[in-house]
């Protein structure tokens, strides 16, 4: 995918930041695996585009993200690895995309990780952004207000209102869902720090009657929207 950057940018306009998924948790000591590319970064910089590399916790099922975040030594290993990679590849920023964390296991450790990473980012001129679900009771431990104190930007993932596991078919991101997500996030995050994440895909649903009782089962296919000018 790194090699397609030129063709992708040729058919788009108005982009000032790209956030490729380049890093993921690779072991329980806080090490990361990397897909980063210097030529990708160079090409973006030549075209006036910043690169905020994304770090994910979802790619390696053998890694316990909650355990890494809950120990000072492994958090330190992780933050150091990210800063080292950012310097090596001349990255403009780091985007943290840690999803599906277990609140009982992680507690306040996630926000402590953001605090510690933010200090190292600031010391090295690296922009820090953090991805977030739409506000709800079960995601309150992500602590968006505290994120806004330390991160440069808080990113709202305003999509997956309905998904493959939903009990009913529906929109990926209806206007009411997105509006409420933005309004609720703005209660904790200053507007100038909020980035709205919109989906470039939709879901095509089909309903199948179940046992003739009037109920239905839903299945979906994801269809990407092509970026174009």
Spans of features found by a protein language model:
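Glycan-recognition patch characteristic of GH18 chitinases/ENGases
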Residues: 1-81
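Electropositive, surface-exposed helix/loop patches at the edges of structured domains
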Residues: 6-9, 85-98, 170-177, 196
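Hydrophobic faces of well-ordered beta-strands that scaffold small-molecule active sites
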Residues: 1, 16-20, 51-55, 94-96, ...
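Structural recognition of alpha->loop->beta junctions
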Residues: 13-17, 70-98, 142-162
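Substrate-binding clefts and substrate-entry loops adjacent to catalytic sites
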Residues: 56-66, 94, 159-166
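Helix C-cap/helix->beta junction micro-motif
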Residues: 47, 89, 123-126
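Substrate-binding surface in catalytic domains of secreted glycosidases
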Residues: 27-35, 80, 103, 107-228
């Amino acid at each position: 995918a790194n090699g397609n950057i030129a063709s992708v940018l040729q058919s788009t306009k108005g982009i000032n930041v790209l956030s490729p998924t380049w890093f993921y948790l690779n072991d329980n000591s806080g090490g990361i695996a990397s897909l980063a590319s210097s030529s990708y970064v160079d090409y973006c910089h030549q075209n006036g585009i910043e690169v905020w590399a994304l770090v994910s916790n979802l790619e390696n099922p053998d890694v316990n993200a909650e355990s890494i975040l809950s120990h000072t030594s492994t958090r330190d290993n992780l933050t150091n690895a990210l800063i080292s990679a950012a310097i090596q590849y001349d990255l403009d920023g780091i985007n943290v995309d840690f999803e599906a964390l277990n609140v009982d296991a992680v507690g306040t450790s996630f926000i402590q990780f953001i605090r510690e990473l933010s200090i190292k980012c600031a010391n090295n001129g690296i922009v820090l952004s953090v991805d977030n679900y739409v506000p709800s009771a079960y995601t309150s431990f992500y602590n968006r207000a505290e994120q806004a104190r330390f991160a440069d930007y808080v990113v709202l993932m305003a999509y997956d209102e309905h998904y493959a596991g939903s009990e009913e078919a529906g929109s990926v991101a209806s206007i009411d869902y997105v509006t409420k997500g933005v309004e609720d996030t703005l209660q904790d995050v200053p507007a100038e720090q909020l980035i709205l994440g919109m989906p470039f895909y939709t879901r095509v649903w089909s309903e199948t009657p179940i046992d003739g009782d009037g109920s239905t089962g839903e299945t979906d296919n994801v269809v990407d929207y092509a970026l174009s000018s």
